[in-house]
Structures are given as C-alpha cells and as structure tokens.
Amino acid sequence: MQALQKKQKTWVLLLLGALLGLAACLCLYGTAPLDPANDAWIWYGYDETDIHQHYAGWLGFRNSSWQFPLAQADALAYPAAEGVNISFTDSLPWVSVLFKLLSPVLPAQFQWFGLYELACFVLQGMAAALVLGLFLYELLPLAAGTALFAFSPIMIERAFRHVALSSHYIVLFALYAYLRGRREQRCFMPVFWLLAALDVGITPYFLPMVAIFALLLAVENALHTRRLPASCGLFFGTCAAGYAAGVVL
C-alpha cells in the first residue's frame, strides 16, 4: 500500500471497503430484500413497525401528484388537501424523489429499501476504509478494521428496521473530510455542503454531527491558515446547504 500513488491508494481503499460492505450485507441478510417486487419482509420480517411507516410513506408519495416542496404527498393525511411531507414518515425524501421520477418504468409493486440498505453497507465500508487509510498502510489491518465497521452492531441494529438511521456513512465521510482537511489544511467545502444537503433528504438526525465536524475544521483552519473567509464559507455554507435542501424538500 505504501508504494501506491495517492490516487491509486484511494481507489484501492474504495474498492476494498465496497467489497467488504457488500459481503457483510449479503452474509447477514441474503438477497431476498434486494428483490424490488418482494415486500413481504417489510410487512412480516420484523417486530418493529417503523419500516411499515417508511414504506407506507413511499407508497403514498409515489401515488401523489408532483408539488412543491418536492417531498409533499397529497395522497396522505386525508382530509388535508396538501397532504403531508414524507420527511415525517422517514421515507428518505431524496431516494423517494429519485424513484418517483423513475416510477413510470417501474413495476406496480416496487420497494427500494433493500437496495438502499445494501448501498448503506457498501458506502459504510468505503467511508471506513478511507478513514482507516489515513492511519494504516498495510492491507491486512486495513481489511480487518474496515470489516469491523461493515459488521458494526449499531449499524446492524438499525438496518432494515429504521432504514434512514442506518445511513452511518454520512457521519464517516464527514469524519474523513475533517481528518484529511486537518492534515492538509484544506476546507473541503463542497464535501461538507453535499453531505449536509444529502443528510437533510435522508434524515436530519445526522446533520448536527456533520455540522460539528465542519465547525471544528473551520475553527482549526482559521487558526492555522488565517483564511477566515474560507473557514466561514465552510461552516455557514454547510448550514446553508442543509437549509436549502430542507426548503426544496
């Protein structure tokens, strides 16, 4: 790993993390939840009903007319004419909007929660590998450490029960941007802005964590480089990106 060029190492880490995340998901849950036409596991697979709420929100949103904010579902919350925003059903607005755009070519029965959970495991592994790659240089320790994140008990406890809250990759990518930004004295503004906007459309629960990393990096950057405008742009831009996503959704 030490002999690899920086860009090569990044791709190796991403591939390693993706494969371990994929292996963890398939090992734990198999392939049944990945079938978009199979929603039996949603209705009967768990004793926790949150996933029912998420799925019902998606079904109502899919059968609603387009309006603004984008995540508003007028097929829900009768008799309210404007319906309700699917943020309140934790139906991952960004993902729901994406699949609603594709709805005309999708089958009548379509659940994407299994596919999103698979993506969570893959992204969790990728983010973990990047974080560990800042400190470890041998393949075996990197793989072992990444596997611990891929099989994280906290992740497993949330997976397929409260799908939005298993998006731990958001926090890990924010941690990576903070650690690398601190090491290289860079702000990584687009990364934090993107994470904030993404997070609001997945679950705002992780937004304070992303904002804290942005604030820490902004303060350290201001102290060490004296580039106050960039530091302000990092933190306040992160907050603004989250707010803008909230307005749109």
Question: How would you describe each model-predicted region?
Answer:
Residues L4, P69, A73-L76, V219-L223:
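Short helical patches
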Residues L118, V122-L134, P141-R182, F188-A222, ...:
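Membrane-embedded helix bundles of polyisoprenyl
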Residues A108, A222-P229:
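Transmembrane helix-loop junctions in multipass membrane proteins, especially transporters and channels
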Residues A23-Q124, S152-I156, H162-S167:
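Membrane-interface coil-to-helix junctions
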Residues M1-D39, S231-A240:
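Start-transfer (signal-anchor) and selected internal transmembrane alpha helices
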Residues L92-S96, E138, Q185-M189:
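Coil-to-alpha-helix initiation sites in intrinsically disordered, low-complexity, charged segments
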Residues L102-L106, F135-L136, I202:
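A broad structural signal for alpha-helix termini and local helix breaks/kinks
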